Amino acid sequence: MANILKKLYNADKRELKRFEKIADQVESYADQMAALSDEELQAKTPEFRSRIEKGESLDDLLPEAFAVSREASKRVLGLYPFRVQILGGIALHRGNIAEMMTGEGKTLTATMPVYLNALSGKGVHVVTVNEYLSSRDETEMGQLYRWLGLTVGLNVSTMSPEEKRKAYACDVTYSTNSELGFDYLRDNMVVYKEQMVQRPLNYAIIDEVDSILIDEARTPLIISGEAEQANADYVRADRFVKKLVEDKSDNDADDDEDHGDYKIDWPTKTISLTRTGIQKACDHFGLKNLYDVENQKLVHHIDQALRANYIMLKDIDYVVQDGEVLIVDSFTGRVMEGRRFSDGLHQAIEAKEGVKIQEESQTQATITYQNYFRMYQKLSGMTGTAKTEEEEFREIYNMEVITIPTNRPVIRQDMPDLLYPTLDSKFKAVVDEIKERHAKGQPILVGTVSIESSERLSHMLDKEHIPHAVLNAKNHAKEAAIIMNAGQRGAVTIATNMAGRGTDIKLGPGVKELGGLAVIGTERHESRRIDNQLRGRSGRQGDPGYTRFYLSLEDDLMKRFGGDRVKDFLDRLSDNDDDKVIESRLITRQVESAQKRVEGNNYDTRKQTLQYDDVMRIQREIIYKERMQVIDEQQSLKSVLMPMIHRTIDHQVDMFTQGDRSTWRLDSLRDFIVSSLASEEYVDSEIDFKTFTPDALKQQLYQLVEDNYQEKEAALADPEQMLEFEKVVILRVVDEHWTNHIDAMDQLRQSIGLRGYGQLNPLVEYQDSGYNMFEEMISDIEFDVTRLFMKAQIRNNLSR
C-alpha cells in the first residue's frame, strides 16, 4: 500500500513539473500583455478564434490565452491570478481535478481554462452546487468574459425553455448540476427538435466536484408523473408496524429463538421481519401466507413502513415543515426541496408522521450524475478535498487528482481528537471551549453532522447567553451571508456539515492576533473528506487557525464501527467518570480505520450503482437515439415505420403457424389481423385460411400496409401533416412503453438481490433479465405502432 501511495505521490509531482514548464510560458507573456491597450487585448479573442479555424489546437494557444485572461482579470476584476492558480488552470484544462485548499481562489483559477475552452465556440458549462453560487459567479466572473468578447449565460430552474436555450447557446453557461441533468432528460422527452434547449455536451468545470460526483453520485435525477396509489394501504401498514417490537439479540447468537418482531442491521441500514413478525402480519391481515404473489403490494407497504418508522430518523434524514415531509441531504445538511424518497418510502414517512400522503409518482425519465457527466467530451473539477477519493475519480471518471501547492504555507494548528464516554459530557466540553474562546473574542465555527445536534448545541449556548448563528437545512436561504461573517471578532456560528460551502470565511480586524478562526467538530463524519472540508474553513491563505474534533462513544460512527476495543480502553482509563476525556493516538487510528471502512463500503456501493445503471444507460442511449432520429426527420418516417410493421407481421405469423399445419392457431392469427391490420370484410374476402402459406400471407399483408400508407398520404395532402402523424404515432408509443419499462427495471432491481440466495450473481441476473425485458419492450413498441398506425382514422386536422 505504501508503495502505491508513493507512486501516486511521485506521479503527482511529475505532472506538476510538466505544468510548471507551461506556467513558465504563460508568465513569459505577462509583460507583452500588460503593454497592450484594452482594445488590443480584447482583439486577442477573435484572433485566437481565427487561429483555431486554421488548425491550431487549444493546447497550442494555452500559454498565450491564459496570459490574456490573466491580464484581463487584473484590469476588469482587480485580481491577478498567482502562479499556483495558473497550475490549477492547466490541471482543469487537461480534464483533471485541481485540489486547492479553501481560500486559494478556485473561482479565479477557473477563469483561464474557461476562457481558453470557450474560444472553440462549442460551449463551456461551469457547474455549481446551488443557484446562489451560479448566480454570484455569473455576475462576478461574467464581466471578465464579456469584456473579452464572450457571451455568458445563467441557467436556473425558473427559466422558460426559450430563456434556457439562450443561456445554453452562450460561450460560457453557469448552472447547477441538477438543472443540467433535468434539462438533458427533458430534451429527450420533447416532440420537436426546436423545443430542445441543450447543445452537445462539450466541456464542464465542476466546482466542489467531490460533492457532485461522489456524494451525490448515487442520487438519480428523476422526472415523474403521478401514478395511481391507494393511500389507505400506507396507513394500514403504518398502524401495524407501530405495534412491533425490535429483536435486539446478537446476530451471531446460537439460539434459534426470535426475541422480537423485526431486526435491524445498522451497518447496512436494512430491516426485516422475524418469523414472529411474519406470523403477526398474517394474523393482523388475516392471511395464510404473507409472501403469496397476491400479497406483493402489502409486503411492499410493510417493508416501507418498517424503514420509515425504525430506520428513517426525523430531523436527521428528513424534517417536517408546514405539514410536509422534506428530505435532508446527509452530506450538506440542506433540505432538498422538491425531492422525494422513491418507491413509496416518502408516502410511508408521511403516514408515520400523520401528514397528508401525496400521490406516488411514476418515473418518466431518469439518469444518475455519474452517467450524465460522463457524456461530456471533457470533464474537470475543483475542490479542497479530493485526494481521499482519488481511486474513484480515476476509475469511474478517468480524472486524475492534482494537488496544487498553496500560495503561502499553512500554519493552522490541527489538534488531536478528544473522546468522551457520553454525548452529554462531550457537548458540555464543547460548550466550555466555546465559552473560553468566545470570552477573548476569537471567532468560532462549530460543525455538526445533523440538525438535531446543531439545535441541541444552540439550546446549550442560549443557556450560557452566548450569541450565535445557526446554519442548517431549516434556514439555508441566508447561509452565505451568515458564513461570510463567521470570521468576525466574537462570532459563533453553528453549521450542519458543509452548509455555506463555496463561500469564503475572511478574518475580521484583529482576529489574526487572537489565533484566527477556531473550528470545532462535534462528531467525526463517516467520510474523512467531509472532516477535512470542515478543517479547511480555517487557516486560509496562510492565516493562523485552530481545529479540534470532539467525539463520544455514543456517536453514530463509534457505535457502528468503533467497536468494543475503544470502549474497553476507555473503561480502563476513565474510572466510570462521565467527564473523563481521552486524548490518544489509538482513538484517532480507530476512528480513521472506521472511516476508511465506511468510505470503502460507500465506494463499493457507488461502483455497484454504476454497474447496474450502466444497463439502463445502454438502453437509454438506444431509446434516446431512436427518438432523436424521429424528431430530426424532415421528410418522411416511412423508412422507420415500415420495418417496424414488417417485423411485427413476421413475428405474429411465425408464432401462430409453428409446427404442423394441423396445430396452427388460425383463430388467433385472424384476431391479430383484424385487431391490428385490416377490417373484417377484408380478412373474410381476401384471405383464404385453408390454403395460404405463411410466406405468401406475409407478402399479402406487406402489400396491405403499403396500400394503407398510400391512402393516408392521399388523405393528408400536405406531406408535413403526414410526417406529423407518423411522429405522433411513434413517439406516443415509445414514451409510454419506455416509462413503464423504467418502472419495471426499477422493480427488477429491487427484487434481484433475492436471487443471490440461489448462488446466482445478482448483477449478471439483472443484466440478463434487463436485456430480455428490453427486447420484449421493443417488440411491444413495434406491435403497438403497427396497430396505432394501421387502425388510426385520418381526419385531416393534424397540425403542430
UniProtKB/Swiss-Prot annotation:
Lipid bilayer topology: Peripheral membrane protein
Keyword Acetylation part of the UniProt annotation: no
Predominant cellular place of this UniProt entry's protein: membrane
Pfam families the UniProt entry points to: P-loop_SecA (PF21090), SecA_DEAD (PF07517), SecA_PP_bind (PF01043), SecA_SW (PF07516)
Subcellular location: Cell membrane; Cytoplasm
Entry's EC annotation: 7.4.2.8
Single GO molecular function: ATP binding
Keyword Isomerase carried by entry: no
Enzyme kind, highest EC tier: translocase
UniProt-listed GO biological process terms: intracellular protein transmembrane transport; protein import; protein targeting; protein transport by the Sec complex
Gene3D superfamilies attached to this UniProt entry: Helical scaffold and wing domains of SecA (1.10.3060.10), P-loop containing nucleotide triphosphate hydrolases (3.40.50.300), SecA, preprotein cross-linking domain (3.90.1440.10)
Coiled-coil region(s): none
Catalytic reaction annotation: ATP + H2O + cellular proteinSide 1 = ADP + phosphate + cellular proteinSide 2
Superkingdom classification of source: Bacteria
Residue sites binding ATP per the record: Q85, G103, E104, G105, K106, T107, D504
Function: Part of the Sec protein translocase complex. Interacts with the SecYEG preprotein conducting channel. Has a central role in coupling the hydrolysis of ATP to the transfer of proteins into and across the cell membrane, serving as an ATP-driven molecular motor driving the stepwise translocation of polypeptide chains across the membrane.
Family: Belongs to the SecA family.
Name of the protein this chain belongs to: Protein translocase subunit SecA
UniProt source species: Lactobacillus delbrueckii subsp. bulgaricus (strain ATCC 11842 / DSM 20081 / BCRC 10696 / JCM 1002 / NBRC 13953 / NCIMB 11778 / NCTC 12712 / WDCM 00102 / Lb 14)
Gene name of the record: secA
